[in-house]
């Protein structure tokens, strides 16, 4: 899958000044961003996150999901480490796009859970494709990750494409009354490893 590097610039944030690397997915025209910090090409496992775009959670402070909180927590963790990488993939709504995501939310308002809503609209529960991660990581010289995720599918996908996942770092944050069913559904139907349901994992603020 052709993904080409376009340009890089500094991105000052409240957490750290990252390098913002821009990539173009030629087949779809989607523009992806990778934030990097420190020396990530030295061969040692890199603290990282693969984060799919969520306009409602990342930019509009929605409490229907935990996406915005996870994004902030990941950026803070990388800043504390002084070294890391965050892939921001333009795969809104687990790959169904923003307008279909709003349609799915409408169905959820009527009682459907997040998986049922996608399926009623004719989509798979999760349509994201992580193959685009490989050329971006290769460009940055990253071959091993300490991956911040609760999603075993991400671990499996990266491992199958030859990226070493040296450690899975749980990322439990952003729980609130509005997303209780959403998080429970991710655990029960999408096999996400959510907090107290798994011994030895500690919630992270």
Curated annotation (Swiss-Prot):
CDD domains found in the cross-reference section: GTP_cyclohydro2
One Gene Ontology CC term in the entry: cytosol
Enzyme Commission number: 3.5.4.25
Keyword annotations from UniProtKB, A to Z: GTP-binding, Hydrolase, Metal-binding, Nucleotide-binding, Riboflavin biosynthesis, Zinc
Catalytic activity: GTP + 4 H2O = 2,5-diamino-6-hydroxy-4-(5-phosphoribosylamino)-pyrimidine + formate + 2 phosphate + 3 H(+)
Stored InterPro entries: GTP_cyclohydro_II, RibA, RibA-like_sf
Single annotated GO MF: GTP cyclohydrolase II activity
Cofactor annotation comment: Binds 1 zinc ion per subunit.
Disulfide partners: none
Broad enzyme group: hydrolase
Pathway membership, UniProt: Cofactor biosynthesis; riboflavin biosynthesis; 5-amino-6-(D-ribitylamino)uracil from GTP: step 1/4
This protein's record includes keyword Zinc: yes
Annotated active site: 126 (proton acceptor), 128 (nucleophile)
Binding site for GTP: 49-53, 70, 92-94, 114, 149, 154
Domain of life, source organism: Bacteria
Residues reported in the UniProt entry to bind Zn(2+): 54, 65, 67
GO biological process, one term: riboflavin biosynthetic process
Necessary cofactors: Zn(2+)
Alphabetized PANTHER family for the sequence: 3,4-DIHYDROXY-2-BUTANONE 4-PHOSPHATE SYNTHASE (PTHR21327:SF18), GTP CYCLOHYDROLASE II-RELATED (PTHR21327)
Annotated function: Catalyzes the conversion of GTP to 2,5-diamino-6-ribosylamino-4(3H)-pyrimidinone 5'-phosphate (DARP), formate and pyrophosphate.
This protein's name: GTP cyclohydrolase-2
Gene that specifies this protein: ribA
């Amino acid at each position: 899958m052709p993904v080409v590097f376009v340009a890089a610039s500094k991105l000052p944030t409240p957490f750290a000044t990252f390098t913002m690397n821009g990539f173009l997915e030629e087949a779809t025209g989607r523009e992806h961003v990778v934030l990097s910090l420190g020396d990530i090409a030295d061969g040692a496992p890199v603290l990282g996150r693969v984060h799919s775009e969520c306009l409602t959670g990342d930019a509009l402070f929605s409490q229907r999901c935990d996406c915005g909180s996870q994004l902030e927590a990941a950026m803070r963790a990388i800043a504390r480490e002084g070294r890391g990488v965050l892939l921001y993939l333009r795969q809104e709504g687990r790959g169904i796009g923003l307008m279909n995501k709003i349609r799915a939310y409408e169905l959820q308002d009527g009682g459907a859970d997040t998986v049922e809503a996608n399926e009623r609209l004719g989509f798979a529960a999760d349509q994201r494709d992580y193959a685009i991660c490989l050329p971006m990581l290769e460009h940055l010289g990253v071959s091993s990750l300490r991956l911040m995720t609760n999603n075993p599918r991400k671990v499996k996908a990266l491992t199958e494409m030859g990226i070493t996942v040296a450690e899975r770092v749980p990322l439990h944050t952003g729980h609130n009354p509005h997303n209780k069913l959403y998080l429970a559904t991710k655990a029960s139907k999408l096999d996400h490893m959510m907090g107290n349901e798994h011994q030895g994992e500690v919630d992270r603020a």
